[in-house]
């Protein structure tokens, strides 16, 4: 799983003073989705995670300055925080996955996730990857020949397979 925070925006509200919303990009199993969270949600997550796993430091809560440079530093800090939680923990708590709106993640530890493969095989070579698919609208082998001339190569191969004892023409 990869997590990035590519951007943030300032929201103004009639009921309360403005706040910053961070856009989180989550890449998992070849799929990408976005989640938007306020700093207060990050802080609440951090408090809960501290009780069950090793957590890195979270950027300071008290930033009264809405200067874009300060908010950019907070964005980078929160991105580093999320990435560190992923790197430092073999199993991610459901609480963390729910925060990122991740619905399914194998619960096996990384070391046991490929139990049927040879243990000497590297983790990189055992990962599945998505490959493009070539799609034919019609079966190219069933279509009529483009010309009236016989296909000499195909006839020769078929003749060799089915009539090996006969001499070619």
UniProtKB/Swiss-Prot annotation:
The keyword Cytoplasm does not apply. InterPro entries: PX_dom (IPR001683), PX_dom_sf (IPR036871), Sorting_nexin_PX-domain (IPR052467). The keyword Nucleus does not apply. The modification N-acetylmethionine is found at residue 1. The modification Phosphoserine is found at residues 113, 116. CDD domains: PX_SNX22. GO terms for biological process: protein transport. GO terms for cellular component: cytoplasmic vesicle membrane. Keywords: Acetylation, Cytoplasmic vesicle, Lipid-binding, Membrane, Phosphoprotein, Protein transport, Transport. It is a peripheral membrane protein. Its main location: membrane. It is found in: Cytoplasmic vesicle membrane. A 1,2-diacyl-sn-glycero-3-phospho-(1D-myo-inositol-3-phosphate) binds at residues 38, 40, 61, 74. Signal peptide: none annotated. Residues 1-125 form the PX domain. GO terms for molecular function: phosphatidylinositol phosphate binding; phosphatidylinositol-3-phosphate binding; phosphatidylinositol-4-phosphate binding; phosphatidylinositol-5-phosphate binding. Pfam families: PX. The PX domain mediates specific binding to membranes enriched in phosphatidylinositol 3-phosphate (PtdIns(P3)). Belongs to the sorting nexin family. May be involved in several stages of intracellular trafficking. This is Sorting nexin-24. It comes from Homo sapiens (Human). The gene is SNX24.
